[in-house]
Amino acid sequence: MPEKHNAERRERYTKAVEQLGNASAPVRLGGVYTLVSLVDEWLREENIEYNERIAEGQVIINILCAYIRSPFALTSHYDELTQDSPTAEGLYKNREQEFYIDKAEFKSEADIRLSILKEIHRRLQGPDENTPGAWSDFEYDFSGSIFFYPVDLTRSYYAKPVNFSGSAYWDEADFSYSTYMDEVYFSESSYQGRAGFNGSIYQGEAVFRGSTYRGSAGFARSTYRGGAYFTGSTYLSEAVFRGSVYRCAAAFNNSAYQYWVDLRGSTYQGAADFGGSTYQYWADFRGSTYRRWAYFNDSICCGWAGLSHSVYEGEADFSGSVFCGALNFGTDFFGKPFPSRFVQNAPCFVAENDALATLFGSSSNNFVVEDSGYPVSLGANGLPLGCGF
């Protein structure tokens, strides 16, 4: 009897995969729901070992992920097809009937892909917060996808690796309050709308390198137990990382922040690298703790830089940077005294190997630090020794 059921499932699987290639959207959607049901059935099958059930289900998960990754020609007309009517100078000028045909096809395909994500999402959520769902033991590969529809994968639990690298999000994308028990890749991706990763837990490496965020980017109150890598990213709107904990290396180097960035109240237990970055507006690092090295070298900060109320237990390197606005170690945003403390070393403002000094564009800096730590030695110009305007 089990063999008969398994054979029937494979027949249904074959037919459902064929349906995914059908020209009719309802037929394709029917194939999706058949595949989803088959995964659930395999997981409920008690006559085979759990690992075998997972293996059978993984085959179907791979098909569903491949459908999400597959190209869709009309995405190149996204800007026009998301309008209510043809634009005056667009591709569909004087082609109104074709516009509405393509718009209907565009919406149908978006609905199919949204349905896949919703079914996966629902099964990645356990009964309680931060607990696995029925599909949490599968691996997911969405790399290189174009998400031309909103993505909601909040409160998801992934027990295995997950890959979103090289993807493009043309609407909002929210991954907040999720748990990743293995590595996760969001690198080389672009976000046209708001991107949310707040309140998440990363047990393995979290890789966000080389990404571009055109809308607001939220990573607040997250915990990274493996390395966290944001190197080479560009933020065109506000970026919020405040209240996070990094237990291993945290790399934000060689990034560009076109608006303000908030990294307040964070703890870095490994090396923290912000070097080689550009801050066009204000950068707020206040109230943070650095257990090892902290690199802010070779950066440009065009606005106010807040580094007060923080503890630096290892080396802190600011050499070769340019602070056009005020640099503040001593007070909060409103002028109340909250000096930082340098526990083992005075902060470095001049690189020893090449004598590259930090430059300042403001005379309103505050270099007051706690007496219980190392001081910032100032020259006659009121700047750290070796530095200038």
Where are these regions (language model features)?
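N-terminal leader/targeting and pre-domain segments
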Residues: 10-18, 23-29, 33, 41-78, ...
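Membrane-embedded hydrophobic alpha-helical segments
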Residues: 1-11
